UniProtKB/Swiss-Prot annotation:
Entry EC number(s): 1.1.1.38
Description of how the protein assembles with itself and partners: Homotetramer.
Active site: 104, 175
A GO term, aspect molecular function: oxaloacetate decarboxylase activity
GO CC annotations, alphabetized: cytosol
UniProt name for this protein: NAD-dependent malic enzyme
Amino acid sequence: MQFTHKKNRSLYIPYAGPVLLEFPLLNKGSAFSLEERSNFNLLGLLPEVVETIEEQAERAWIQYQGFKTEIDKHIYLRNIQDTNETLFYRLIGNHLEEMMPVIYTPTVGAACERFSEIYRRARGVFISYQNRHNLDDILQNVPNHNVKVIVVTDGERILGLGDQGIGGMGIPIGKLSLYTTCGGISPAYTLPIVLDVGTNNQQLLDDPLYMGWRHPRITDDEYYQFVDDVIQAIKARWPDVLLQFEDFAQKNAMPLLNRYRNEICSFNDDIQGTAAVTVGTLIAASRGAGSQLSEQKIVFLGAGSAGCGIAEQIIAQIVREGVSEEEARQRVFMVDRFGLLTDGMPNLLPFQNKLVQKREHLQGWDTTNDVLSLLDVVRNVKPNILIGVSGQPGLFTEEIIREMHKHCPRPIVMPLSNPTSRVEATPQNILSWTDGEALVATGSPFAPVTLKGKQYAIAQCNNSYIFPGIGLGVIASGASRVTDEMLMAASETLAKHSPLVNNGEGPVLPELKDIQTVSRAIAFAVGKVAQEQGVAVKTSAEALLQAISDNFWLPEYRNYRRTSI
């Protein structure tokens, strides 16, 4: 199919001179043409040679290679982003496999921990509780008039690192970089926001460099009222925006999602995005083994909002494959620090209640313990799939993995906790303990493992396979909501792009070099379901594909023409 493109048209720019060079979305640096240098008062402000973006990217790549630590590389890339965003995305696109772990997990974790120390330049919006009476003014100060995607955090549960206060801003910045890199969403349409509601991290409160509000976190009614005020202000400024909740604490994540998912186009990536990519991976892994997800028994370590969100999405997929909901729930076992979730346990959270196992079904289990540990569960359930979302390293022990492998010749093991320092077990250990027979997918990137002369690719079950395509699909279709069915469509589409499924061998997930193709396909599937469900205006398939193409931004310089403000 041939698409028409509008991206070769000139841009009319009201800025000139040093102001233009300081505008990251518009700055071309040494790539301004001689005509543009004359028209925009740039003569003498740049070296003589007019370069192409590829020449600029090659210089930046050479400079990047001169940095020895991942955090220094991260700082360097962020400086380019804050100087020339088009060059930043061209550079990332040229070296995606190398740089994605640097701009996001795992390196972004260290960047969040050291946010106030390595701070260079403002990016995004910092909304402090102290300024709660000035929300409209704060959002009016944002120069982007056509914001289409916002990622917002309150910094309380950053990856597996806990409360990082305003340091959590590193996550929305990094996440939106992936919306652009993987999903083609123009950086001009994106906005990172951190809600500064204080911090309970004493190390930050004692740090003289900490740039956030030095106050214990506000809670309960004060907190929820503040979040509501912010969201109402966002709705007033950008009524059609897609709002992604990111790294909120377990106690707040699900209530906020349930409160706002039908009020504003929104989703929680930790709960729904993680669930969608995990289900897509499991569908592909099951099909690659010649079976269906409905034939598997699944054990979770970690029963927080993310783990339970994944479990509910798995159950929905099992039901789609023809199994009753009651039977589907009997195939999913949730283990937390208090053991297997069972009926009658005290202090269960609302979202955990439907995921408990009935004690009467466990009467014949081989155990003498009142608290059923992960090892007890693995020994008695004999699962095909083991998923870790605990945030605690090393909990998938050799004994547990070997016990699983004893009853399952091709176990699927997914230690998903981020960053790498929090992973439940390393791929190297899992493969060693299973004689190379496990199928391993992780949340953070790991290098291929060589065992007995054979190399094993490690699939990264990363949300970046899902959320950029969802964002692109929402924008292209004009969807007003993100529904469960749209998320399921994303999972199915990801599974269809699995090399293991399509070729009978290879990794369970597509290579990163193919991620834009996957994102476009997910965008189409998501947009189509949105239209079918009535949350987007129905169009032809051709029109939806054209809208996806029109909205897919590429890091290329456009010609500038000068205009007055």
